[in-house]
Amino acid sequence: MSFDRPASNPPDDAEGLPIGWDAAGYDWSAPQSHRPDPGTLSLGVTHTRYSIDDWGSAPALASAKAVLTATASYQNQHILGWGAENPQPSPGRFDWSSLDRRMKMIRSTRGTPVITLCCAPDWMKGGRPGETNWKRLEVAPRPEHYADFAALAAAVARRYPDVRHFQVWNEMKGFWNAAGNRWDYESYTRLYNLVYDALKAVDSTIAVGGPYVVIDIWANAKNASHPSALAGTCGVVDQRGLDALDYWLRHKHGADFVAVDAGLSTRDQGTITATTTSGELFGALTRWLRQRTSLPIWWSEFHVGRADAAGQQKLTARAVAALLHMADQGAAAALIWEPQGDTGQPHAPALWTSTNGDGGGRPLAYGEAVARLQQVLAGRAGPDAVSWPASELGLAWGREGVLLVHNAGDRIDLQIQGRPLNLGPYEVRYLPLRAGTPVEFAVPGPSAPTAPAGQCLRLTDATASSAETR
């Protein structure tokens, strides 16, 4: 197999080295920050309980901040939970101290801040004023307190005027209709509309998004309690998440982006084992969403599961492949969940190691891959920067380099300008190639083409038609 993309000879100082050998590696001493780019996928993170907190050693914090600067255009923080204490413990009394610390850290690393308006103080959901019961964190506010929560959202917007993007709630937590065995999208949308109106009253240019609903996947339609018509080689989408999305699209007062969430697991068989399929799923869902709405698509909670140390390389390749599929299909943003590493086992791929201790805050393989992807997308070579010459091989082209992800468990042998390049199982590699001269990649032997997004999830006229009415 051969194909052409804009590239050039390696830099002079790389002559004689195996093709693809990046002599310098990523320069973490001078990390380049990236502003969100409306023309391509903007990568970001969602900070969770532990994320570059003050009690880490100074060298570890500095190292982690360098990784964060290079990898995250957007940095998202919840207002209560996931690293933030209760901002309004009782009516009329505010405590911004923990949220202030997180916002200060985001500013210090040149991130574009995002706030997720979740969760609600206890007194809004039946608890005693002044108390915070963390076991009830994910309980939704009571309807009689929806206006109070909207007022809290407005107070947050006034305190942090540099925050231009707000997500309303998280995964519709607490909004469940048990009698109907479905999401309580009516109640969520009522809350969303009150929050939307309150934020726009503070500043009409603030960007507000929802519904931050989980899109569940089944491996087999026979096992699905609520199968949808949106199905294909990647599985069957659960109808209940689609119903919630469609109701919100039809009844929202307004929105500036659509927030969604999905993972690499199925409801019936656990983790999706076909690595090429798992990446294609995010591209197919992005394509379907873009046919439902003209709003930008945000993957508000991106994570790919957990593994022990031996499985981290595979998960990293799966994550990068999914990000390439999102970019290829026109997603606007992807927020990586929990960017700081967990010392326990198994754990999710992280961008840097824990900052709790000497030698912490070091960049991990996932962090370097995301930093390189940021670099490539920022300097992308033309409108079609992402290509899939084979189902297991993805490329993202920039003006000065290309990022390759090999998403399979065997070795793959390539050729660039007649010189060999070997990628190992689940390898992600950056090649410092300048744009300008066509380069032929030769993939010896047969390789199945990547499945088009329409086969991964077949789009019928009914599933692809726009759901938005205003």
Task: Walk through the language-model features, giving the residues of each.
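N-terminal substrate-binding region of glycoside hydrolase catalytic domains
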Residues: 9-155, 161-168, 172-183, 213-215, ...
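Aromatic- and carboxylate-lined catalytic core of secreted/periplasmic carbohydrate-active enzymes
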Residues: 16-27, 307, 321-410, 427-451, ...
